[in-house]
């Protein structure tokens, strides 16, 4: 530990001299209040420190003490269902201790509760050989999450002692005799620096789809477990609702939700909604698998920059246990703005639109920590992190640097469209400009595991929507009546896909989540209707007859998305009704017309 003194304060940036023994990325206690800061630049004996708390009132001459350790998170039981700020301070306990609704400066508080006791059940015996990543035992943290206590990275040897019972996160639970004769005393908790990715044995190709229950995503633009997706869009297009929906219903074990520089009301919504929502696969509250990191727009700017790293490090910890994790960052634009502000105060050469030249590498650094991996340890385990980042380009201009640097790295682009949002089409994901580079892997996985030609259905539906886009140009010029009857059927099929399938009400109890089996049934019915209608047209029926004879049928197809999951048979039975109805129309008028 070394001590220096402040020579300059510029917003969240503090310059201190006499810091020759300090290292870059060291955590410091700044000023008489002992504010938390991190060294981000060293020049001779002067250190530039970004302070994670409000710096008003700090002045030259006040002391700066380094701790000698980097910004780290505490990883152990007590993470799930908790709400932390950007540097992992527990906000609920913070409020209880300070009796204030605001972040009181200089308060030193352990990240994990030191008094809570956890029931540890050993999984190994004394004398067993262990290595980094091996699971020593488990703690049932919530009804949904079994917290696996692992051997820390860099430790291996023979298990000399292991105890069962109730322990706090600081009490010694096991001892490992290492090769050099030293004994490592382990607790339920371990620390890890946030800016360093946790190691793994091997990176694997992600193939299993992340089912979100959102039809437009799961059907046309799927993301895999271990993939990375970006959600850019203008204000009011529904980025946050898309993020919330994925956080609520994704088929993952753990969800990390990082509110980075967004409105406080959005985190309040999460806190109000999540405890009441039931996970469709387990029947438990989804809060029992969620970690919240709140760094709202009125919190210190520097902590925004740390919040993304805090979130991904916690995600890596659960990944190492063998869990599938989804991390939502809302919004990475605010994080990039924090980088821009700190870069400006450091007087660095600005890049495009004032962002630092290293913006692209920082964004890549974050998304590259996602992925499907084979974890460390003697037993084979697989874990994955799916990273989904919202991007808020000013004015919806996706040519700006944050969006462009993000799109270079991620393989899924859910482009939100202001025009769709204005037409009240939600989720407002534009099916013509969005893309997913995981379509082939997901299609092959579903065809193999579900034994249905899913990729073929998706291609057919997308072709109909693309054809509609081409026909709309003609309709605008010369009107709908100028189209051939076949083209008018295509326009009708596209309308059904858009309104009866892609459009989804996040606030309707049934429509908010659609299981994969229900998605297959809904899309199959629309495609069956289109195929049978085209067949009837070829055999002599008129477009007008088909439309007039299927009013009630089309209404039933439209309403089928509001049928409950446990009544899936009703949707599947509709396929037979579609065929019968169109055969009937053909029998009544089609063949007569052909004769005449």
Swiss-Prot record:
Keywords carried by this UniProt record: ATP synthesis, ATP-binding, Hydrogen ion transport, Ion transport, Nucleotide-binding, Translocase, Transport
InterPro entries per record: ATP-synt_VA_C, ATP-synth_a_Xtn, ATP_synth_asu-like_sf, ATPase_F1/V1/A1_a/bsu_N, ATPase_F1/V1/A1_a/bsu_N_sf, ATPase_F1/V1/A1_a/bsu_nucl-bd, ATPase_F1/V1_b/a_C, P-loop_NTPase
Binding site for ATP: 233-240
Enzyme Commission no: 7.1.2.2
GO MF: ATP binding; proton-transporting ATP synthase activity, rotational mechanism; proton-transporting ATPase activity, rotational mechanism
GO biological process: proton motive force-driven plasma membrane ATP synthesis
Source organism superkingdom: Bacteria
Enzyme class of the recorded protein, top EC level: translocase
Disulfide bonds: none
Chain's role: Produces ATP from ADP in the presence of a proton gradient across the membrane. The V-type alpha chain is a catalytic subunit.
Family listed: Belongs to the ATPase alpha/beta chains family.
Alphabetical list of HAMAP family matching this protein: ATP_synth_A_arch
Name the record gives this protein: V-type ATP synthase alpha chain
Source organism: Streptococcus sanguinis (strain SK36)
């Amino acid at each position: 530990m070394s001590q220096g003194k402040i020579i300059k304060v510029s917003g969240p940036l503090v310059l201190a001299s006499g810091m020759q023994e300090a290292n870059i990325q060291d955590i410091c206690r700044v000023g008489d209040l002992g504010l938390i800061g991190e060294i981000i630049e060293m020049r001779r004996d002067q250190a530039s420190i970004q302070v994670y708390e409000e710096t008003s009132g700090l002045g030259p001459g006040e002391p700066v003490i380094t701790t000698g350790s980097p910004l780290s998170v505490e990883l152990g039981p007590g993470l799930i269902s908790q709400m932390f700020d950007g540097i992992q301070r527990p906000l609920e306990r913070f409020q209880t201790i300070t009796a204030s609704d605001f972040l009181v400066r200089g308060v030193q508080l352990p990240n994990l509760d030191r008094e809570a006791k956890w029931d540890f059940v050993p999984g190994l015996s004394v004398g067993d050989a262990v290595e980094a990543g091996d699971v020593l035992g488990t703690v049932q943290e919530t009804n949904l999450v079994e917290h696996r206590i692992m051997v820390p990275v860099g430790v291996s040897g023979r298990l000399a002692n292991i105890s069962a019972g109730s322990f706090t996160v600081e009490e010694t639970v096991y001892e490992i005799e290492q090769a050099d004769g030293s004994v490592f005393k382990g607790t339920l908790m371990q620390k890890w620096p946030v800016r360093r990715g946790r190691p793994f044995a091997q990176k694997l190709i992600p193939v299993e789809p992340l089912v979100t229950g959102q039809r437009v995503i799961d059907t046309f633009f799927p993301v895999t477990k271990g993939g990375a997706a970006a959600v850019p869009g203008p204000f009011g297009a529904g980025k946050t609702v898309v993020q919330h929906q994925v956080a609520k219903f994704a088929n993952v074990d753990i969800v990390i939700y990082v509110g980075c520089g967004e409105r406080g009301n959005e985190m309040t919504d999460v806190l109000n909604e999540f405890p009441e929502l039931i996970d469709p696969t387990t029947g438990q509250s989804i809060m029992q698998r969620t970690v919240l990191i709140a760094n709202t727009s009125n919190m210190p700017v520097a902590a925004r920059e740390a919040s993304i790293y805090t979130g991904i490090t916690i995600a890596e910890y659960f990944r190492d246990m063998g869990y599938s994790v989804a991390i939502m960052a809302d919004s990475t634009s605010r994080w990039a703005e924090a980088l821009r502000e700190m870069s400006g105060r450091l007087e660095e050469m600005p890049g495009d639109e004032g962002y630092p030249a290293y913006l692209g590498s920082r964004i890549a650094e974050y998304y590259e920590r996602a992925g499907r991996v084979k974890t460390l340890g003697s037993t084979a385990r697989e874990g994955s992190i799916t990273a989904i980042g919202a991007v808020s380009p000013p004015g919806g201009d996706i040519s700006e640097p944050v969006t462009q640097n993000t799109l270079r790295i991620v393989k899924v682009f859910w482009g939100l469209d202001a025009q769709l949002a204005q037409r009240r089409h939600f989720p407002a994901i534009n099916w013509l400009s969005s893309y997913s580079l995981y379509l082939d892997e997901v299609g092959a996985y579903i065809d193999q595991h579900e034994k249905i030609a899913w990729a073929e259905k998706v291609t057919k539906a997308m072709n109909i929507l693309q054809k509609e886009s081409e026909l709309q140009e003609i309709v605008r010029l010369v009107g709908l009546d100028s189209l051939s009857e076949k083209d008018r059927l295509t326009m009708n099929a596209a309308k059904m896909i858009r309104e009866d399938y892609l459009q989804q009400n996040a606030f309707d109890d049934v429509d908010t989540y659609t299981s994969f089996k229900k998605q297959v049934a809904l899309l199959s019915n629309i495609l069956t209707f289109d195929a049978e209608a085209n067949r009837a047209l070829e055999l002599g029926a008129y477009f007008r007859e088909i439309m007039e004879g299927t009013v009630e049928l089309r209404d039933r197809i439209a309403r089928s998305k509001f049928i409950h999951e446990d009544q899936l048979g009703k949707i599947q039975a509709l396929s037979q009704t579609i065929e019968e109805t169109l055969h009937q129309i053909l029998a009544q008028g089609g063949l007569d017309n052909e004769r005449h």
